Structures are given as structure tokens and as C-alpha cells.
């Protein structure tokens, strides 16, 4: 983003916290983006969980505890005074392993979960995939049981705050994440 555009965030920050979601393919990219934007945000969410990212991005990172640890550690080493939230993928055998790696690297909180998948949708009129990327994340009410399972298991495994997301449509859905 351009410096002028980033400065506009300060007006927003007077009214509400701004959390920047960062996406990349290496420690350097995540750290560079964080360094360039740290003065304009209240927290960073490191998105290491997008299921439809091209190879080397998103869940390709978040499925690997070592890569997750290295990226979180790199950003945390460069950005000392801005909280780091790591958004986790549910598409792993043991989400607590990834959560612990992020916590050990210095994450201040975790977001659970990103979309599930990838999945595929076909446009019946054209007989072609709906997404240009062909595959994409599956979201909506049907992922809530998966999100709840991930939050439940992770809550028992780490000592940092959790943001439970995924499949929430009503206040009753949100309340389930609190229990």
C-alpha cells in the first residue's frame, strides 16, 4: 500500500482498532510488510492458512509447524510492540501442533479457523469451475462444527487468547464458541 493510503488508517484507528491481515510466501515478505505498516495498525494477523493460495503461500505454510514458527518468529523479532495474531488452518491432522509452534514463536493470539478445503464448484451453465483459481476455501454454516472442534482442542493446548471464527451466523452460534 502507498504511504498516503496507510495514513488514512490513522483516522479509522481513532474510532476502532485496525488489524492488518498479512499474506506472503516467506519470512522476508511477512516481515517486510509488517515493517512497512506497523505504524498504522493496532495488530497483525498472519494469514498462514488460506486453502486456495498458490503453492508456497497460505495453508502450505500453516500446515507445517516449522514454517509457521519461523514466520511468526521473524515477524515478532522485527515488530516488538504490535500484537501478532496467527490465523490457523483446520486442514491439518493436529491443529494443536501448529498452535503450539505459533505460541512458542511469540504469537500473542490465534484465530481459528480459516476456511476448509480447498473445494470445487462448477457453474452448471458453462460446465467450468466458478473460481478462476479452480479450487477455493469452503466457508459458511457447515464449517462451524469443525471450527468448534479446533477451538476446543487448541484451548486445552495453549495459553494465549483465541479468536473463534468460522460458520457463525447468529449470536447463538457465537455463544457456542465461548463455552
Which functions belong to the PLM regions below?
Residues 1, 51-66, 98-160:
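Glycine/Thr-rich beta-alpha phosphate-binding loop at enzyme active sites
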Residues 1-63:
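Active-site beta->alpha loop and helix N-cap motifs at the rims of alpha/beta catalytic domains
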Residues 3-14, 72-80, 103, 151-157:
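Surface-exposed amphipathic alpha-helices with a cationic face
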Residues 18-22, 44-46, 84-86, 110-112, ...:
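Hydrophobic faces of well-ordered beta-strands that scaffold small-molecule active sites
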Residues 23-25, 49-51, 87-91, 113-117, ...:
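Active-site beta-loop-alpha junctions enriched in small/polar residues
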Residues 28-39, 92-105, 153-160, 168-179:
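Catalytic cores of alpha/beta
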Residues 50-54, 77-78, 91, 96-97:
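Outer-membrane beta-barrel porins/channels
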Residues 62-66, 79-86, 91-92:
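Divalent metal-binding pocket/active-site signature
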Amino acid at each position: 500500500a502507498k504511504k498516503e493510503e496507510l495514513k488514512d488508517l490513522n483516522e479509522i484507528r481513532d474510532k476502532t482498532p485496525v488489524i492488518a491481515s498479512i499474506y506472503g510466501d516467506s519470512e522476508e515478505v511477512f516481515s517486510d510488510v509488517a515493517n512497512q505498516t506497523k505504524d498504522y495498525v493496532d495488530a497483525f494477523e498472519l494469514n498462514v492458512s488460506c486453502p486456495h493460495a498458490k503453492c508456497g503461500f497460505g495453508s502450505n505454510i500453516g500446515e507445517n509447524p516449522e514454517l509457521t514458527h519461523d514466520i511468526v518468529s521473524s515477524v515478532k523479532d522485527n515488530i516488538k510492540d504490535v500484537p501478532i495474531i496467527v490465523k490457523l488452518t483446520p486442514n491439518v491432522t493436529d491443529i494443536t501442533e501448529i498452535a503450539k509452534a505459533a505460541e512458542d514463536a511469540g504469537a500473542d493470539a490465534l484465530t481459528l479457523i480459516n476456511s476448509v478445503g480447498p473445494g470445487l464448484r462448477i457453474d452448471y451453465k458453462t460446465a467450468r469451475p466458478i473460481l478462476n483459481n479452480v479450487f477455493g476455501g469452503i466457508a459458511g454454516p457447515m464449517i462451524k462444527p469443525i471450527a468448534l472442534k479446533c477451538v476446543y482442542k487448541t484451548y486445552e493446548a495453549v495459553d494465549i487468547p483465541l479468536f473463534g471464527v468460522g460458520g457463525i451466523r447468529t449470536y447463538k452460534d457465537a455463544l457456542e464458541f465461548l463455552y
